UniProtKB/Swiss-Prot annotation:
Keywords of the record: Nucleotidyltransferase, Transferase
GO BP, one annotated term: prosthetic group biosynthetic process
Example GO molecular function: holo-citrate lyase synthase activity
Pfam families: CitX
Summary of the function given for this chain in its UniProt record: Transfers 2-(5''-triphosphoribosyl)-3'-dephosphocoenzyme-A on a serine residue to the apo-acyl carrier protein (gamma chain) of the citrate lyase to yield holo-acyl carrier protein.
Keyword Repressor: no
Family: Belongs to the CitX family.
Reaction(s) catalysed by this chain's protein: apo-[citrate lyase ACP] + 2'-(5''-triphospho-alpha-D-ribosyl)-3'-dephospho-CoA = holo-[citrate lyase ACP] + diphosphate
InterPro entries: CitX
EC annotation from Swiss-Prot or TrEMBL: 2.7.7.61
Top-level division of the source organism's lineage: Bacteria
Name used for this protein in its record: Apo-citrate lyase phosphoribosyl-dephospho-CoA transferase
Entry keyword Hydrolase: no
Species in which this protein is naturally found: Citrobacter koseri (strain ATCC BAA-895 / CDC 4225-83 / SGSC4696)
Length: 183
């Protein structure tokens, strides 16, 4: 289910392309839920800037896939189907997992907090009915910025940090994960 980093398009995506890609992801999510009738993990990489499909985002994505599969295996959950694809909005992963949706979301939240790359992953858990379980369902605060203690959404909206600084931080986190041999 991994994506080859060397095949990244490095295409600078436009806002209309990004919106179409997100609509297409929602349609894929709906199709998966209809097909499996089980919770769905929909997984992407937090990718600031216009280039969403890069060697960097694919390497971060591949770590996430490995970590998600390890979580499912450790919990004894069956993965009915898994797929990875590269879209205009970057790498996307889908895993239909036979597990209680709430437990699955708690496990992905823990993964986002414990793994060196967890802050760079956007892991959504959808119930079989199509409801997205969010951090708010568990009274958790909004995600923090990669570079400061502000809300990530506030910094992104205000373009508080230079794109180059964000990418350097992402590279450093990936280096740390690679160096510690953590999947």
């Amino acid at each position: 289910m991994h994506l080859l980093p060397e095949q990244a398009t490095r295409h600078a995506v436009s806002i209309p392309e990004l919106l179409v890609s997100r609509d297409e992801r929602q349609a894929r999510q709906h199709a998966w839920l209809t097909r499996h009738l089980t919770p769905l993990v929909s997984f992407t990489v937090v990718a600031p800037g216009p280039i969403k499909d890069s060697e960097l985002t694919r390497r971060i994505f591949n770590h996430g896939v490995t970590a998600l599969l390890a979580v499912a295996k450790k919990a004894g959950w069956s993965v009915r189907e898994q797929a990875a694809l590269a879209s205009a909005s970057g790498p996307e992963g889908f895993l239909a997992i036979e597990a209680p949706a709430r437990d699955l979301k708690l496990a992905t939240i823990e993964l986002e907090h414990q793994h060196p790359l967890g802050r760079l992953w956007d892991i959504d858990v959808l119930t079989p009915e199509g409801d997205i379980l969010s951090r708010r369902h568990f009274s958790l605060p909004a995600r923090r910025c990669l570079l400061c203690e502000q809300s990530a959404a506030e910094c992104a909206r205000g373009k508080t940090h230079a794109l180059s600084d964000l990418l350097i931080r992402m590279e450093a986190l990936l280096h740390d994960a690679d160096s510690s041999h953590i999947n």
